[in-house]
Amino acid sequence: MVELNDVPGEEEFPRATYLETMVRLLDTVSYNDENFTDEERVECLKYAYGKAAEHFAQPHVQETLKVPPKRMAAALKTIVGMCVYSWCRVSKEVMADLSIHYTYTLLLDDSREEPAGTMATWYEDLLNARPQAHGWWRLVNDFIPNVLRHYGGYCQMNMVRSTIDFFQGCWIEQHNFKGFRGSSDYPGFLRRINGLGHCVGSSIWPIELVDEEEHFLEITTAIAQMENWMVWTNDLFSFYKEYFAERDQTSLVNNYVECEGITLDQALDKLCKDTIRSSEEIIQVFHDKDPKMYEILTRFIQGYITWHLCDDRYRLVEVYEAAGDDPVAQKFKKYAESARRVGAIDPARYCVPSVTELCEREMAKQSAGRSWDFGLGKIANKISSVAQ
């Protein structure tokens, strides 16, 4: 495994530039999340979390993933929030299945496991319907039909292909490679394959909402636009937490710096301009298309931003608390407060029972089963001895 890079210090963080870039994006999309009432949001969170927690508490899933309960709980809470807040017009069943699929991707993204030793027969095993050598692929292949059933064939193919791309992107990240100087195509290449943009862009359109053939051209365009918008927005809002995370030093912004020889402020500005341009294009392209599709996209944008501003993973409350009193900082604070009014939901309202509790119950069942089997074995031995 390649050594991870040093993490920069707090004093080096470009706080003023970062606040300005976030505010510029929030202004561009006219951020104001009205996707749910409080009761609706909690109801959807509770349903999706419950279904996903049951899935990940299964003994064979736990044994294969070997993820500590605390990390599993954090990952599940994060992804359920993303799927509910962003996919606000789909059924609760779709939210739940997407929550499970994207939790698998988050767990892989946070993993440090080197996959090379288990991937030599990946395609051969897939072609011959043999179990994959890599445990993550065994679980994902087993579950993904539950997700795909909600979509038409075109979106299904995009989602599967994008998931494969994502795995390869995580594989590259295991090498902590920011790219060679002068390779200006590398940062975008890596971000496209590890961003799940096509999977997300396709999964916005389940057949319960949209006829795939009727809206084929709009769906294709939306996938093309969301490929960049979704990952660039994520890069912008996750920049703070990734800046201080040892595992996340191969971020898009850092890769721009390494490959193009520009400063961190210049790289942030580049990301901001690209994200704003993408946001403007989505609005301009779809505002005169089918009203339902425009509404789905704009509500996705609002919810996706709310999720980032509220989820503990992104630590943006720290940025909020450290923001000063200048006009840009004050504007960011107002946006953050607006997001938290609708999106900062106490986990006790929906993480019940928690995935940790469900895992403990399953372990207790297994332990009781082993004790029962052992007791029966002792009785059988005694009977056998008496019979002799």
From Swiss-Prot:
Induction notes from the record: Expression is positively regulated by the cluster-specific transcription factor TRI6.
Gene3D superfamilies: Farnesyl Diphosphate Synthase
Cofactor-binding details, from the entry: Some of the cofactor binding sites show unusual localization within the protein.
Cofactors named for this entry: Mg(2+); Mn(2+)
Annotated region (Aspartate-rich domain), positions in chain: 109-113
Main function: Trichodiene synthase; part of the gene cluster that mediates the production of the antimicrobial trichothecene harzianum A (HA) that plays a role in Botrytis cinerea antagonistic activity and plant defense priming. The biosynthesis of harzianum A begins with the cyclization of farnesyl diphosphate to trichodiene and is catalyzed by the trichodiene synthase TRI5. Trichodiene undergoes a series of oxygenations catalyzed by the cytochrome P450 monooxygenase TRI4.
Official protein name in the record: Trichodiene synthase
Native species: Trichoderma arundinaceum
Gene that specifies this protein: TRI5
